């Protein structure tokens, strides 16, 4: 290799500086890969390449990592900073052997034998000039851009045409101290290191580029030859009294309607457009948990992303983030309503496949869709779908639609060998551009059909949207889930493949709820969501700025000292910083008088801001319930607080998809936190410290509307124990409307019929709607709910229920 200060290399670096734009994965190797800045470090690369090392040099200079041109000096031994597995490929003939590179491994290992305290970090580095996966029928393009083993001439062409799409990926370091101690330092170990590194680089390339793309028509013909589709076509012909040729044509039409037509060229163009768009819209996109997903890809998992659905922006945001995190954008299940010009064709070329909202008993369509989904899994494409079935209009997670999850489960049952893993994803925004539309729809206005004019309308409204949040939740590997739910599932299916197992539907329902719970476990507490939570808990949606900042400091400290889960993310900075962020986004207004500043939510925006509060209400609902217990009782034993929370938690869990593993332990941690913060003192009982009552009252207000719902339900059940589920739902909804009208409750979810349906299902499951239920439990929970309400609200509920019962 020429010296790094030679005229040739200086010229090469100058050319690359103007032609090459490099993206680093991960963005912060020190933080994401736990690299130790105080230990010596060497790089291992697949192929010796002057241009690759020049690109790496640019990046290491920016990241503060050792330059690949600087030799590694350890114990008096000088070794190259970069170890390559194979030499450069000449324009003609064969490349040189890898003996010189094995010698490098040997020298590094030998140094560890001489110096027991030495531990060199060996960091694998992969470089990609473009990320085209290639096609099954590639010919000319593959010959020109042979990416894995290019000659210097091909590399020049790649830099010229693909230099703006250069990716440098760092991987977890290998400890040479561990290798030397565990396996020795001879040539055999050097060979083993080289073999492991080659496998690593091969897997990394597949993670970065994805599997080769099929010819679309060839894919259709392949699918039509499958046994299940042939059978479905025959049944369609028999049932509709048409020829098999006509039924086959219908199946092809369905495939054409459904199937994606992924284009790497369009993805590259979209990447540039989206980079411009995000920079225009957002001041930053916060990502948490991407490394675990990258590792799952590397380990050969079939990944299914299951994000929450807040906005049409979700389709773009997750794919963009995955692309920049060194993973292939998934094939996305999009509603057929989005298949309009020009969005539909663009989405399809970006990897979207389209699904009808209802299959309406169409067996042929069902068979075609299922076979297409199976093929995506079989070929190794990652998939994305929204299990809620539509965008949330209230900011809360919707009850899951189980259709896609059931199809994924069935694909596993039909024999996918690789592990299939669902990755829940929390998507959050400081500003959702459809919120005003959601409010109108909840008020009774008919939803507009998606069209190109809506796209233009949305573009006109682009502005400062603050920050976006992408948090990856705890993954669920389906094979492990099935082993947990039905240990003998493989044997059962082998014995009778055609028989639908009795445990399948309940297992799908449990899985769907677990996915939603894991999404909420990964929530992002941001400046907008936290400030909305505080201000909407006040009577006039307004608070003195200093008190608001103090309350936000309390919430931030609570989330950090008693974390909801390890997947949850919390905004950086203090309360003062969060308030300033919210004001800069024009989400809140501030006015000043001689006594100080008051921050508030404008009356016209109050209902819309409940959307952001609802994104994180589950993070604070139990602490809020605890605060309510404390502020409604002068003294209360710790165990009584634990018992009250235990009574309400099953309903909270069903309503808000909560996943607290040990509820009593969590309650005690929150109580200990209140004591540590000086809000509460404990002798034999718990007592609120008078000067901090206002903070706990403000926190307690966040659970008040939830407790009002439960008070309505349990007062009805106590008065009419034999009430049917349908009656309970309708009567609860009617009383909620009356309560809202009398007490000014405007939150949309308070009147949501589906929410009362969810609660009634849970009540039946808990036995509260059974003929032989224990009425004492209902009365106890009714009394607890009533005791935590404002007297005027309690009076309205009790009087309304009593009057209705009398009638």
From Swiss-Prot:
Pathway entry: Phospholipid metabolism; CDP-diacylglycerol biosynthesis; CDP-diacylglycerol from sn-glycerol 3-phosphate: step 1/3
Subcellular location(s) of the protein: Cell inner membrane
EC supergroup of this enzyme: transferase
Catalyzed chemical reaction(s): sn-glycerol 3-phosphate + an acyl-CoA = a 1-acyl-sn-glycero-3-phosphate + CoA
Keyword Acyltransferase carried by entry: yes
SMART domains: PlsC (SM00563)
Family: Belongs to the GPAT/DAPAT family.
EC number, UniProt record: 2.3.1.15
GO cellular component: plasma membrane
CDD domains per the UniProt record, alphabetical: LPLAT_DHAPAT-like
Organism domain of life: Bacteria
Keywords noted in UniProt: Acyltransferase, Cell inner membrane, Cell membrane, Lipid biosynthesis, Lipid metabolism, Membrane, Phospholipid biosynthesis, Phospholipid metabolism, Transferase
Protein name, entry field: Glycerol-3-phosphate acyltransferase
Domain notes: The HXXXXD motif is essential for acyltransferase activity and may constitute the binding site for the phosphate moiety of the glycerol-3-phosphate.
Gene Ontology BP annotations: CDP-diacylglycerol biosynthetic process; fatty acid metabolic process
Membrane topology: Peripheral membrane protein
